[in-house]
């Protein structure tokens, strides 16, 4: 007798769940977030490994941009953005119009990381590849390509250079403190030895005094 009521309850909760999921998808579409795949090829002129922090920003001709900070920090273990390596990153950001026509790099670190190319993949669009001709980005400045407007001078992104706390050790180790001075002979004696030595000296002095009389 309770099966029909259970079926009605199940259908009701299923309807609520589907409606909620549909509302979430609508909210995500309204927010305009899209997934992107970023493939970074590091030049063979780059160091074997790097502590540099690499950020990128790419955009379309309408001025929409996607900012992906600290790509190097997403790679764990050896080989991350190292010499001759290829690393893939999943980035989510504002939905861009086709085609993606600008990409800039920001490098912050001591190692001089050298990019070979960066390729951007987006859903339903052809990938776009930006070659960097093995040139090193200047330290903590935006460097890259803007193919969105071929009639005007390419402009750098209107973003300040990212400021990250350094996660790399200093290039040269700090000078170690000088060793402590060596203890004197008296300081090396324990309390018992000091008392015995004082008693022996006092006894010798007393004997010398008696012999003098």
Swiss-Prot record:
Keyword Signal belongs to the record: yes
CDD domains named in the record: PLAT
Start-end of Pro residues biased regions: 157-183
Signal peptide: 1-21
Glycosylation sites: 149
Residue segments, region Disordered: 147-188
Record localization: Secreted
Record-linked InterPro entries: Embryo-specific_ATS3 (IPR010417), PLAT/LH2_dom_sf (IPR036392)
SUPFAM superfamilies in UniProt: Lipase/lipooxygenase domain (PLAT/LH2 domain) (SSF49723)
UniProt keyword list: Glycoprotein, Secreted, Signal
Location, primary (coarse class): secreted
Gene Ontology terms: cellular component: extracellular region
Swiss-Prot/TrEMBL GO biological process terms: embryo development ending in seed dormancy
Organ and tissue specificity: Expressed in seeds. Expression is restricted to the developing embryo.
Superkingdom: Eukaryota
The PLAT domain, residue ranges: 34-148
Functional note: May play a role during embryo development.
Annotated protein name in UniProt: Embryo-specific protein ATS3
